[in-house]
Design a protein with these regions (language model features):
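Short sequence motifs at beta-strands and strand-loop junctions characteristic
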Residues: 22-31, 39, 57, 85-91, ...
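Residue-level signature of outer-membrane beta-barrel architecture
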Residues: 38-42, 53, 89, 97-100, ...
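Membrane-embedded beta-barrel scaffold of Gram-negative outer-membrane proteins
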Residues: 100-103, 107-108, 123-216, 297-299
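Outer-membrane beta-barrel "beta-signal"
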Residues: 132, 318-332
Length: 332
């Protein structure tokens, strides 16, 4: 590793800085889960119901000693900085149903309670609903779904990579209150056959509306007003892949990914914006034998440099630069 100093400040790459109170920690969890699930067949209608109960214990210990990378030396004694223990339990239910309209078309519905345990805080909880249709005719497959997640307790933990203006040494969990995420999703894939060549095409598109339901202020979420957008959730995403597969063993594809704009915090300012951006990748592959292929991949063909992230904290991250990869793969 190297250090470089310019204009009185350090930049570029830094060497090992040793352990401190934030990263010299040990977290342990144990959980016991019980679940029941039953699927009922009513001909064209299938209904599945489920129940899950989970008991879990959590322990978080932190040491203030800085002894370099040898963790064994600093974790032999009692955790002098923090030692907390918690016991929790939670239950969730789910429901799912499919109805076959005909051999090509299926209706789908589902409701699932969700839970994410958090260290030293109430778990994150959400009610998740999906409604959609699936169509398949042998030459292609199409899915269209509406989805909704209603968070009663949106939770986040402060870490070095979270991008929030909080102190990672505290390992605090912040609540964003209630929030709603809903949208529409479309997935389609088709294969068009030619003379010795097939042409697979797939597209995926998602439109999302994600907002806070209440106003709050915290070091993690910042100043939030009811109706503000949730950070890092773009209004839309789209992926398009088109390629070819020949009988001679030559294949390739083009992938286009388009991501809408978003923000790194709810109160979006000039330096919190995440740009809408597009990425184009090309891939070409040739089978030499049944087991060996050679390939060439060109990523970010247009070499765009849009800002796509502002995490870890205090830094804007751009797209991966144009990258060329040449190699081979072998199947054992």
């Amino acid at each position: 590793m190297y250090k470089r100093q310019a204009d009185g400040s350090l930049s570029a790459l830094y060497g090992y800085i040793g352990l401190n109170n934030s990263n010299n920690r040990l977290r342990e969890s144990s959980a016991t889960s019980y679940y029941l699930q039953d699927t009922m067949d009513f001909g064209r209608l299938n209904v599945t119901v489920g129940y899950r109960s989970e008991d879990y214990d959590q322990r978080h210990r932190r040491w203030s000693d800085r002894a370099g990378p040898n963790l064994t030396m600093v974790r032999t004694g009692e955790a002098d900085n923090r030692d907390t223990f918690a016991t929790n339990d939670h239950t969730t239910q789910s429901f799912g149903a499919t109805y076959e309209v005909n051999e090509n078309l299926t209706l789908v519905a589902g409701f699932h309670e969700g839970m994410t345990p958090m260290f030293g805080a109430d778990p994150e909880e959400a009610d998740n609903t999906e409604l959609g249709i699936r169509y398949s005719d042998g030459a292609g497959d199409v899915e269209i779904f509406y989805f909704s997640s209603e968070y009663s307790n949106l939770a986040a933990e402060c870490t070095l990579v979270s991008g929030a203006a909080c102190n990672p040494d505290e390992s605090a969990v912040f609540s964003g209150g209630s929030a709603d995420v809903e949208g529409l999703e479309f997935n389609g894939s088709w294969v068009f056959d030619g003379d010795g060549v097939s042409y697979p095409v797939s597209i995926a598109y998602t439109s999302t509306d994600a907002t806070f339901n209440n106003s709050s202020e915290s070091d993690y979420f910042g100043v939030v007003a009811a109706g503000d957008d949730l950070p890092y959730i773009p209004s839309s995403t789209m992926s398009l892949v088109a390629g070819f597969v020949s009988d001679s063993g030559l294949s390739g594809n083009m992938r286009l990914i388009d991501v809408g704009s978003s923000c790194s915090i709810a109160a979006c300012g000039t330096y919190n914006k995440i740009h809408a951006h597009t990425i184009v990748d090309l891939n070409l592959r040739k089978a030499l034998t049944d087991a060996m292929d050679v390939y060439v991949i060109l990523e970010n063909v247009t070499d765009d440099e849009d800002i796509i992230s502002r995490a870890p904290s205090e830094g804007a991250r751009s797209q991966k630069p144009r990258t060329l990869k040449v190699g081979f793969s072998y199947k054992f």
